[in-house]
Amino acid sequence: MASPTIAANAYANLARVLENSGAGKGSEASGQSFASLLKDAVGSVMESGRKSDAQTVAMAAGKANVMDVVTAVADTDVAVSTLVSVRDRVISAYEDIMKMPI
């Protein structure tokens, strides 16, 4: 299970991404699209996974500390959990919209 500090850092990173993307500013023409926001989020999760894999390989080669590997894996776990939560909410919203009468 991820520590509260790791979770707080993940949510702070997400808030920073949303702030930089212009989310919450209304329908501003210069804002980032929802698709590009999701693409950035998925890219961030993939990068976190790559870092975790690199730390694991480095530990197997004797070049990394176990604590670094555990931290990298926990960061990846939080990122994936956050992405899964977002996916679930998007699916739920889509299902709610599909149930609405025309």
UniProtKB/Swiss-Prot annotation:
Pfam families: FliE (PF02049)
InterPro entries found in the cross-reference section: FliE
Disulfide bond annotation, renumbered to this chain: none
GO (cellular component) term, any one: bacterial-type flagellum basal body
GO molecular function (one): cytoskeletal motor activity
GO biological process terms held by the UniProt record: bacterial-type flagellum assembly; bacterial-type flagellum-dependent cell motility
Compartment annotation: Bacterial flagellum basal body
UniProt keywords, alphabetically: Bacterial flagellum
Family membership noted in the UniProt record: Belongs to the FliE family.
HAMAP family per the UniProt record, alphabetical: FliE
Entry protein name: Flagellar hook-basal body complex protein FliE 1
Species for this entry: Bradyrhizobium diazoefficiens (strain JCM 10833 / BCRC 13528 / IAM 13628 / NBRC 14792 / USDA 110)
Gene expressing this chain: fliE1
